[in-house]
């Protein structure tokens, strides 16, 4: 998300947890300001503490507590870089009111109530500025599930041309789930004839006990 920027003005994570991904992106991109939202009150407080422990001035970060999809804390603010590892296939209300929400309304369908993956993706794209880059970790299902998700996927690829790269990751690299995942990279400034880059990194790991690990050499090869 830092490519093309000598220095990011800001970086945003809508499901920031304790803030580790935010801090990493901000560090690599030399971001001036850090923004995030976290639903869990305890984790929200950890994120704020984490910022201060890493030397981020209080005036240079804004972490909000709340449900990102139900109560967006950042209105129509847009950011240079948007990163997130949202909860996989989480449930959300998919209430009728969201059909008139600018984050979701243009896609033609709402993400299903039992799989909010595309709700998070559309939310993130809404907050991405025209020259920015977004990266989101998601389950493989977002690549092929049909119905409403198929409509949204077609909107993002065919109508908007926002999908820049898809990186297939190994299974079992995240604690708590063994499902294969991917990183989706989005840009709003792509040219009409730009191709989508596909990277199969499913074999790029080292097995450590019951967990698969991405080592620096694997990350370097992917990049």
Predicted regions and their residues:
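A conserved structural/catalytic subdomain of Rossmann-like adenosyl-cofactor enzymes
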Residues: 72, 76-223
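Short, solvent-exposed loop/turn segments at the edges of secondary structure
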Residues: 29, 58, 177-179
